């Protein structure tokens, strides 16, 4: 019995890999990471340029924002153009919202005078036109992760209002108000499942996880973080610990560190720099997807290899070139 085909995006400039028979399906997990998650756009461009379309997407925080737009049928290039226009205008609304006011509001927390942002209202301002209002209207099935503050567990959305689910997933404490859904106070999904590839088990043949978390990069001017950096980095330290523990027991087939860990989580104004930094990883992802999907049938691909540490010194033709080389070809058994 043949496997279902991947659908091809019409904006691809080359023959779609999904036009081949028995092409395995792909589940795509987009992790949380603040501004670093703008790199998701570049990774989605890799899919579009190959003519591939994920069978299902799971997203957390900024991964939920980007994932909701893409699952609505908005091509990655359109997302790139929209995001650049939104964040690079000199006097644009988002420069005020994301570059200045969060820090002022953080200071207000300590004086009791802070009023936090409404995540749904912010989404209404920043989301591109064409994002589906309801999960049922999405082109690609989507799972969005938020965190239940009081029950201290993940809340996964697969139905209902898309904007409400995304708002809950991105409601980072100290910046956004919790989003109340069915009498539950929901906050940033990264606090319970920052890289939700495990939600895709059984939904697709190959699971690809895009990790945009990364570790803090030391400032050469001082040997300790600023107060704001420490506040946010502490949350991401916790999230990276969750991911590491998950990887010990359950791994995606392709784990992609996006290469943007040296950016701060509020560096949204550096959108061009972040996208440029993600470009080499995008090309490696394209090469890996082409290699995997060029085999005739899925059984010719070995089970996922153990997680590997990327190495700048690894030979160019190495069969194990790091986290992007977790699968290798297996010659068919003709006996």
Model-predicted regions and their roles:
Residues 1-60, 68-335:
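Patatin-like phospholipase
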